[in-house]
């Protein structure tokens, strides 16, 4: 679709009442969150040109200037099938021993974004929880169709495990975290690590935040939020079409490309999965958690009432649902990194 997709003409919080295309009942957006969501109108369909033009202006310099308590090191993760990919590692300036690491995989529908864009919202964890943050510059679709990005993340985990001691990282405390379009890459990397018997130490835990897990886009939440939310069904299908090179919804798709296609979720790292009540990813996230439980894997699941996709990125803990979501994530990370 052209980058000239029109701005959505209705307020998101009133879309169910105003948009005649919305015929299914659906939960309302949280009243305290609604003014913030409504103040950010977006094109009805977020195409690849629009998403790639969206630049938050985050650089290594801006991160370090705002956070003098951390240091940064850039590494190249070698790949057998392509050029190396960059891995940024943020560590405390002072540490007393090997630290846990959060291996972060950025969002952007697998078609946009970069390894630095979300770091400002994460970097205080370095000091608060005493950990290292690693963020990988995986290859994007459609230039590199799935599972290329997931393979990059898997290679990054293998490299990190192998070099953990020299990096000041505890190899038994590697937690992988994917947000939105980064979540299927995190989930796929866990499947790869299980199937390939990752060298050194397995991934300890996985964190899948507002996860983009299912290319079939046919759940109740997919239909409820086809229109009238920032990341809607139109945009979701567009991103999957790019990621899967035209194979979306077919049988020619593996679980490394689309984790929801996996039939065996046994022997996986314990998981934290969360989703917003008012987003297309809600029901696929719940089903993935249920399938983990069915297969004997452990998962903590949260569905946040009244939230939209990545609602807690507003980083306003005074909004009760935002504060609760942020607190739950951090409490889980503390438990994982201390257990």
For each predicted feature, which ranges?
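Alpha/beta-hydrolase active-site loop signature
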Residues: 109, 138-145, 213, 308
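Short beta-strand-to-loop junctions in surface cap/lid or active-site-entrance loops
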Residues: 87-98, 260-265
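Alpha/beta hydrolase fold serine-hydrolase catalytic domain that processes acyl esters and thioesters
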Residues: 171-173, 187-339
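A glycine/proline-hinged amphipathic helix-loop "lid/cap" segment
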Residues: 1-90, 338-339
